[in-house]
Amino acid sequence: MYHVPLIPRDAGREETIFRINQSLQKLLRVSDEIFDRVEHRITRIHGKAEAIDRRTEVLEKKLESLQESDKVITFTLPRQLPKLPEEPPTSTSLFRINIDTEHFPGSEELPAFRRADDHVLRPCEPIDFTYELNKPDKFFLTSQVLKEYEQKGWERYKKRLLGGLRELSRSPEHIAELFYAGTSIPAFEGVSGDFSKKALDADDDGGTSRSGRTTDELAQLRLHEQLLEDTALSSTLMQEDSLDDNHPLAFRINFNEKKKKTAKMVEMPDSLPNLKGHAHDFTLRDPEIDEDRLLDILPADDQIPEASEPTEAEADAPTTFILPPPPPPMKLDPSPQPAATPVEITEIPPIISPPAPPPPPPPPPPPPPPQTPSASSSVTFSPTKSVDGGRSDLMAAIRAAGGAGNAKLSRIAEKPKRKGKFDGILESSALLGASETPRNSAPAPDGGGGGGDLMSALSKALDARRKAINGKVEAQPPAKVSSTIPAPPNFDDEEWD
């Protein structure tokens, strides 16, 4: 395989270019070799294909010659069929690893097994499982106590086993490490399993005379061997077992009470650890991926809230929605606003539509009708904005008409009828109150005309203003209210007759 060497950072430019050039040349050489090999292989394949074609042609010619021959071909069987090869005996040995070796050494050529993993890279001969299982030092020990076992031996190691338990490690390799090798003794706290009991004193035939232990001491020391079938490990292993005792595939032990002493079951371990190249565990599942570990991650069924159906009262209750606040009113010029029509909301749609744009401003009021001059007045002037009560407008109109001498004025009583629309500017309606007052009083000595003329009214108004300023107010009866009210439009005196 071609590997491209990396160029260091501190390499110069020339060195970098040189290394890149060397790498490219090497890549070309490797590519040429690969193409040459592929071409050579293709040539070999073509040669094999041509040989097959030639063999096929020969077979076709033989078939054609057989079809054209007139002879009858018969096949005769021998009197006895050839003997079937004997089936190889069922192997009772452990796993054979070096199966491709030409020579399998015998047991006399192998050194004695001092450790359980001495046979990992050597072939094994047929052995007696019962004998091997009874040997406590046959199987691989846990990694936690392997070093101690090699140094101090089996007796001191057995005392350490019964001295106390250790805390469970965070990441055990497999379930076999949870127990001591060859026994059902848990190696950690809170671990147990469905294993058969096995005496620790197998080397001294289970007797108490050699070990010097009493029955109470042995019972206390073997507390770690007792099975706890209701533990988490055993219940997890059996929770998915769908085969009960009545199932035809269920395993049953034909145990006879009469042959209780002679019957002996072969006990097989569930795992054979430290066998490189083979599975560690064939029956038990890894506790790291067991389903009981997922209970802390997945939500439980009772914690999932269920959707409750609404009651009749809730279903009949009207749905209320919160409307957005109305937009602020727009400031418009003071003008008569049209009356707002009430809107009845019968049902609010589920989707709130955006607020409607504000209504357009009302049209401006129509201009006032054009002023028509009255037939009774011969003086016309354009109205201006009154600032001092109308006196300046009146004096300007008099000056524009050529003075008071040229004004053609007449009394109100001389015209019984007044036709035309009231425009609020006629002199006759403006001097109505002043013309009625001198009827009952004597004419002013300085008046230049009759009691109802314009100049006399002006002179009286000026005298009254002057007296009011000086504080000399004469007690006069108040004028009628009707005299101060201007006539309505289209007024006709005939209606009052």
Swiss-Prot record:
InterPro entries: WASH1, WASH1_WAHD. Keywords: Actin-binding. One of its GO terms (molecular function) is gamma-tubulin binding. Coiled coil: none annotated. Disruption phenotype: RNAi-mediated knockdown positively modulates lifespan; effect abolished in hsf-1 mutant background. Increases resistance to both heat and oxidative stresses. Increases localization to the nucleus and also DNA binding activity of heat-shock transcription factor hsf-1 after heat shock. Increases in transcript levels of heat shock protein genes sim-1, hsp-70, hsp-16.2 and F44E5.5 after heat shock, but not in unstressed conditions. May also moderately decrease levels of post-translationally modified hsf-1 under heat stressed conditions. Residues 323-339, 351-372 have a biased composition (Pro residues). Residues 341-350 have a biased composition (Low complexity). GO terms for cellular component: cytosol; early endosome; recycling endosome; WASH complex. Residues 306-497 are annotated as: Disordered. Pfam families: WASH_WAHD. Expressed in several neurons located throughout the body. The keyword Repeat does not apply. Belongs to the WASH1 family. This is WASH complex subunit homolog 1. It comes from Caenorhabditis elegans.
